[in-house]
Amino acid sequence: MAGSGRDDPLVVGRIVGDVLDPFVRITNLSVSYGARIVSNGCELKPSMVTQQPRVVVGGNDMRTFYTLVMVDPDAPSPSNPNLREYLHWLVTDIPGTTGATFGQEVMCYESPRPTMGIHRLVFVLFQQLGRQTVYAPGWRQNFSTRNFAELYNLGSPVATVYFNCQREAGSGGRRVYP
């Protein structure tokens, strides 16, 4: 069960607790930016995640559909996450054994642009009961993965992976000139 052990990266990274309740992983989820495969807790720079990632969903039946949610629970900053969760991407009706490009994009991908601190970017995969209509939220900030799953009767997640991202040096901010 994901989130049941102290050494589980989803517990250590506080994904279980801040975003999700403990769950059982039953499907494979592969997320990659270029050649870089996302593994729990890895560090990716904002310049590496500007383009929509390649997402491959496991499963063994194309008649089973999945919903993918990507959120930042640390918006606008980890010390003051008053926009928690910030919705970066929402794709539904992804057939099993395929990828996000085969699903219905409800909210287009917005690349992470953290300004302060280390942000966790979380990909959560849910198995749907069947094809369904999902409406785009009115805004991206203060999204709740738990409430979304309840609203659309998605149950517990079937897979999750996350990475850490922080502002790159030299990417803006105060400059002092002699």
Curated annotation (Swiss-Prot):
It is found in: Cytoplasm; Nucleus; Endoplasmic reticulum. Expressed in leaf vascular tissues. Specifically expressed in the phloem including companion cells. Gene3D superfamilies: PEBP-like. One of its GO terms (cellular component) is endoplasmic reticulum. Induction: Expressed with a circadian rhythm showing a peak at dawn and then decreasing to reach the lowest levels early in the night in SD conditions. Its main location: cytoplasm. It comes from the Eukaryota. One of its GO terms (biological process) is flower development. Keywords: Cytoplasm, Developmental protein, Differentiation, Endoplasmic reticulum, Flowering, Nucleus. Belongs to the phosphatidylethanolamine-binding protein family. Probable mobile flower-promoting signal (florigen) that moves from the leaf to the shoot apical meristem (SAM) and induces flowering. Promotes the transition from vegetative growth to flowering under long day (LD) conditions. Acts upstream of MADS14 and MADS15. May also participate in the promotion of flowering under short day (SD) conditions. Interacts with FTIP1. This is Protein RICE FLOWERING LOCUS T 1. It comes from Oryza sativa subsp. japonica. The gene is RFT1.
